[in-house]
């Protein structure tokens, strides 16, 4: 059985793991955080139809219920190298090594640093937050400004 390592347990990584496991591959899914779908799980609702993020996370977790999938959470892959025998060597931040016939990198995205757009006031004015920060506040019902107070007014800029 061919082995494949997938780096990243977000939507793309999980979908790939599910499809490849059903095709008979031995899949190892690496995720640097302590849970899969972390970026999605921190949101309340998803665009464009406002589906609850928790529902999507639950559905994606079901796709991992396959004996051909091994999850390695809290495992930050920091190096990837091709060995002489055409096997891939993956090394994590703790120095542990893993070997695989194939590798798929599905590491997701990095949110835009709003500090780079000074004209929006992020980091300058206490009440300015990004849409991702607002999503997280809504998700965990902790809508507060930088002083820890619940805002009296909210405005959205696009």
Model-inferred region functions:
Residues 64-78:
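A conserved beta-strand/loop element that lines the FAD pocket in flavoprotein oxidoreductases
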Residues 100-113:
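Glycine-/small-residue-rich beta->alpha transition segments that form the dinucleotide
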Residues 73-75, 92, 130:
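Short loop/edge segments at beta-strand edges and connector loops
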Residues 112-151, 156:
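FAD-site-proximal beta/loop scaffold in flavoenzymes
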Residues 2-67, 155-158:
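Beta1-alpha1 glycine-rich phosphate/pyrophosphate-binding loop at the start
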Residues 24, 68, 100-101, 125, ...:
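Short, well-ordered alpha-helix to beta-strand connector turns
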